[in-house]
Curated annotation (Swiss-Prot):
The gene is PROSCOOP17. It is found in: Cell membrane; Secreted, Extracellular space, Apoplast. Belongs to the serine rich endogenous peptide (SCOOP) phytocytokine family. Residues 32-87 are annotated as: Disordered. This is Serine rich endogenous peptide 17. Brassicaceae-specific phytocytokine (plant endogenous peptide released into the apoplast) perceived by MIK2 in a BAK1/SERK3 and SERK4 coreceptors-dependent manner, that modulates various physiological and antimicrobial processes including growth prevention and reactive oxygen species (ROS) response regulation. Interacts with MIK2 (via extracellular leucine-rich repeat domain); this interaction triggers the formation of complex between MIK2 and the BAK1/SERK3 and SERK4 coreceptors, and subsequent BAK1 activation by phosphorylation. The keyword Cell membrane applies.
Length: 87
């Protein structure tokens, strides 16, 4: 029994080390999910506001045309062919 005891100790220690490694990965994946708002996490609100700002900047960049802003011609009313009022 004494010959197998160190083997079990090493096995248990290795399993503990590996399990902490795997749980670390699970934590890294689970932090990407949105957090519940009732927790009052100010960090999550900051990230959310930053995302909104980035989206607004991206929308502004897409709306510009390649040739630059162009002036629209104002609408000109066509002159009436039979003059109904004196000019």
């Amino acid at each position: 029994m004494t010959g197998k005891a160190p083997f079990f100790v090493i096995l248990i220690a290795a399993l503990l080390l590996l399990s902490s490694f795997f749980f670390g990965e699970v934590k890294a994946i689970s932090t990407k999910q949105p957090k519940h708002r009732k927790l009052g996490n100010r960090e999550g609100d900051e990230n959310r506001s930053n995302e909104i700002v980035v989206q607004m900047k991206a929308r502004v960049k897409r709306s510009k045309s390649k040739r630059g802003p162009q002036k629209k011609e104002p609408y000109k009313k066509p002159p009436c062919s039979p003059p109904t009022h004196p000019a």
